[in-house]
């Protein structure tokens, strides 16, 4: 099968490489976001999918807005005769003229069990909501985002210690396995599919920068889920002694709850464990954190270096 591939970040590059190595497909071209400056450098750098495509000498197309540049895109893609377009974390919505351009239209790998968690942040939102399982969906692309018919789904378990980084790895592995499984069934005809139960749809939006700021008046479980949902891409943050403090890794504490809690109050336990009181009276144990302008550290290192005082708080 001859395909065009649309994607941008690291996990999408992993799927691209799996498709190339599978020998089930011939990747004719890749479409990815334009090069962007990374870190402190002002020099634009190619993203992971572009790097992987160039490694295999696959033609790469980049558009600032594929919607506005769709005529050019269609002209570019017209140089090839792709059977199918495969999309995974491209970063832009494809106009109908583009996703319907290939012989068998286009399929998308989505990081949830549709119709649950349609939208931009299904992996983060599953963690944020405290899900114990999620999954992937391979769907046809339709006119409305994430509403296309379903070809295949696969469940993924969420472990208590998972964060967005580790869960995204699981999602990607499940997606690779499922797409290769699907491609093995190709007989020259469109893949069979079933409509979504649109009346059961739920939605998730983009994670905003203000979502990073922790409100210690929330329940400890809510805060723990938010922290792992934000890691490693955005990082939850609070303040300590009027400076920023990033909270990287936590776990709920079994310490008995207190009446009339002081949200954000710090508690030292066994001289090397750090707990923060939350709005429900329970404690959240801080495992790893990063003070402003310093490297990440364990709670034990933080306690040794900062020597917290009675009554001090985060936030």
Swiss-Prot record:
GO terms for cellular component: cytosol. Keywords: Protein biosynthesis, Transferase. InterPro entries: Fmt, Formyl_trans_C, Formyl_trans_C_sf, Formyl_transf_N, Formyl_transf_N_sf, Formyl_transferase-like_C_sf, Met-tRNA-FMT_C, Met-tRNA-FMT_N. GO terms for molecular function: methionyl-tRNA formyltransferase activity. CDD domains: FMT_core_Met-tRNA-FMT_N, Met_tRNA_FMT_C. The keyword Protein biosynthesis applies. Its EC number is 2.1.2.9. Disulfide bonds: none annotated. Belongs to the Fmt family. This is Methionyl-tRNA formyltransferase. It comes from Leptospira interrogans serogroup Icterohaemorrhagiae serovar Lai (strain 56601). The lineage of its organism: Bacteria, Pseudomonadati, Spirochaetota, Spirochaetia, Leptospirales. The gene is fmt.
